[in-house]
């Protein structure tokens, strides 16, 4: 089926329903494109790094507006496109359409929410059922999740990943060797990349999330040295100020969902890496609710645990 990407873009931005067969075609085309990308995608500067989106479509549109737009800016998205917010489908499809339209300008990395198990609990599955009356569209999207890269490397100097490091992974080549085209395992290197968090710890420690590890400055310094990189850019954790540098600037957390869960009151940020590797942060706030569109509260059918907050 031939799809008109520009027409779909307009429909997504206006919040119109996307037919199931159109979603299927988009997902099939996206899989075909993504399967040829490396586990660690290569990206050139200048580039803008974006953190979690979590279905906040109107804030995603603001992100593009504030950072130049995909027509003239290169982007790396660090995962967690879905769940929590009420426009997970539209947010993910918007990014897929941009990926298909401008394949060299958008790099999409898998987050811990881009899995079947997590989306069943945290909103995406229920959203699709509410909008379509069946789970087909959810299944199509989950198949695309399996093809997303696990990381990116910018100018051989900045390693991008959703969560963090793993005791099972020392080098980027070990990440490149992973068979990524699967549901995220409950443990091991692939799991840790999507689930781990930096913390003030002396060595690898158990994560309170129940998956991944906590890692400290020593682990970051070692990874930077062994792989000859200067920075780890990751997302995965809410930062009230939008971004947070740690470990003498060797790691940064970027968070791009303002007023997360429509109640946290945080600002969001994106990080632009210039050709000389200079870092420039852009801060933005949530879209205000207007005419029932934007940062509005919509009741969900099922109570959701808050352990990601």
Swiss-Prot record:
Principal place of residence: cytoplasm
GO cellular component: cytoplasm; nuclear periphery; protein phosphatase 4 complex
UniProt-annotated location(s): Cytoplasm; Nucleus
EC number(s) reported in the record: 3.1.3.16
Pfam families in alphabetical order: Metallophos
Any one GO molecular function term: metal ion binding
Cofactor: record remark: Binds 2 manganese ions per subunit.
Chain positions found as Leucine methyl ester: 309
Cofactors named for this entry: Mn(2+)
Keyword entries, A-Z: Cytoplasm, Hydrolase, Manganese, Metal-binding, Methylation, Nucleus, Protein phosphatase
Catalytic activity, as annotated: O-phospho-L-seryl-[protein] + H2O = L-seryl-[protein] + phosphate; O-phospho-L-threonyl-[protein] + H2O = L-threonyl-[protein] + phosphate
Residues annotated as the enzyme's active site: 113
Protein residues bound to Mn(2+) 1: 52, 54, 80
Superkingdom as given in the UniProt entry: Eukaryota
Gene Ontology biological-process annotations: double-strand break repair via homologous recombination; meiotic recombination checkpoint signaling; negative regulation of DNA damage checkpoint; negative regulation of glucose mediated signaling pathway; positive regulation of double-strand break repair via nonhomologous end joining; regulation of TORC1 signaling
InterPro entries: Calcineurin-like_PHP_ApaH (IPR004843), Metallo-depent_PP-like (IPR029052), PPA2-like (IPR047129), Ser/Thr-sp_prot-phosphatase (IPR006186)
Subunit structure comment from the entry: Catalytic subunit of the histone H2A phosphatase complex (HTP-C) containing PPH3, PSY2 and PSY4.
Family: Belongs to the PPP phosphatase family. PP-4 (PP-X) subfamily.
Function of the molecule: Forms the histone H2A phosphatase complex in association with the regulatory subunits PSY2 and PSY4, which dephosphorylates H2AS128ph (gamma-H2A) that has been displaced from sites of DNA lesions in the double-stranded DNA break repair process. Dephosphorylation is necessary for efficient recovery from the DNA damage checkpoint.
Designated name of the protein: Serine/threonine-protein phosphatase 4 catalytic subunit
Annotated source species: Candida glabrata (strain ATCC 2001 / BCRC 20586 / JCM 3761 / NBRC 0622 / NRRL Y-65 / CBS 138) (Yeast)
Gene: PPH3
């Amino acid at each position: 089926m031939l799809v008109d990407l520009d027409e779909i873009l307009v429909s997504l931005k206006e919040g119109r329903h996307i037919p199931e067969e159109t979603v299927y075609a988009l997902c099939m085309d996206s899989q075909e494109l993504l399967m040829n990308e490396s586990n660690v995608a290569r990206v050139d500067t200048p580039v803008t790094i974006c953190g979690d989106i979590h279905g906040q479509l109107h804030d995603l549109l603001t992100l593009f507006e504030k950072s130049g737009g995909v027509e003239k800016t290169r982007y790396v998205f660090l995962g967690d496109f879905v769940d929590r917010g009420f426009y997970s489908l539209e947010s993910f499809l918007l990014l897929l359409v941009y990926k298909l339209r401008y394949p060299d300008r958008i790099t999409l990395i898998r987050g811990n929410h881009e899995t079947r198990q997590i989306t069943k609990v945290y909103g995406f599955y229920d959203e699709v059922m509410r909008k379509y009356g069946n789970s087909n569209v959810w299944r199509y999207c989950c198949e695309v999740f399996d093809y997303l890269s696990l990381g990116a490397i910018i100018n051989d100097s900045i390693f991008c990943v959703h969560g963090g490091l793993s005791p099972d992974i020392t080098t980027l080549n070990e990440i490149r060797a992973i068979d990524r085209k699967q549901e995220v395992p409950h443990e091991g290197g692939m799991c840790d990349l999507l689930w781990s968090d930096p913390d003030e710890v002396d060595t690898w420690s158990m994560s309170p999330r129940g998956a991944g590890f906590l890692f400290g400055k020593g682990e970051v310094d070692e990874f930077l040295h062994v792989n000859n990189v200067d920075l780890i850019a990751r997302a995965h954790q809410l930062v009230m100020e939008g971004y947070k540098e740690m470990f003498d600037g060797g790691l940064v957390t970027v968070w791009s969902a303002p007023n997360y869960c429509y109640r946290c009151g945080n600002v969001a940020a994106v990080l632009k890496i210039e050709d000389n590797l200079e870092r420039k942060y852009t801060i933005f706030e949530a879209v205000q609710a207007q005419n029932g569109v934007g940062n509005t509260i919509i009741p969900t059918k099922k109570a959701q645990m808050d352990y990601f907050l």
